[in-house]
């Protein structure tokens, strides 16, 4: 069944220079909470990705059916996008997004050059 994403909760990607920054929202949040940071970073020239974590920004029933493996996959898609165009990748996260910045710094130290949890 197709999920309807709330207006403003869509994932975002903004092309810039070779420094990429992934910004992740928190538990039950959406990209609305991190989009202003993403836009400010993009305005400074950075390449920015803001994934919508699976089950967020749709219906609570969708969120109830998702968990950490789903959210990790959501982030991995945007990390792969950044890795394909950036020589340095950083990760900033709000709340649970901050926890994921620590997680990915541990499992992908070859990719993540710094974090802002």
Regions found by a protein language model. Give the residues of each.
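Conserved beta-strand positions in the Rossmann-like core of class I SAM-dependent methyltransferases
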Residues: 49, 89-90, 113
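A conserved short beta-strand
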Residues: 110-117
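Short, surface-exposed "cap/lid" segments of acyl-processing enzymes
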Residues: 3-59
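Active-site signature of alpha/beta-hydrolase-fold catalytic machinery across serine-
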Residues: 103-107
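Catalytic nucleophile-loop/oxyanion-hole region of alpha/beta-hydrolase
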Residues: 59-90
């Amino acid at each position: 069944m197709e999920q309807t994403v709330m207006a403003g909760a869509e994932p975002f990607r903004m092309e810039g220079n070779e420094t990429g920054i992934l910004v992740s929202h928190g538990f039950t949040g959406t990209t609305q909470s991190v989009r202003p940071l993403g836009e400010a970073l993009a305005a400074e020239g950075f390449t920015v990705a803001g994934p919508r974590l699976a089950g967020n920004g749709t219906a609570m029933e969708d969120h109830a059916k998702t968990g950490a493996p789903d959210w990790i996959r959501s982030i991995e898609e945007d990390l792969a996008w950044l890795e394909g165009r950036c020589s340095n990748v950083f990760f900033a996260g709000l709340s649970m997004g901050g926890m994921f910045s620590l997680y990915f710094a541990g499992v992908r130290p070859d990719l993540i050059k710094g974090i802002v949890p």
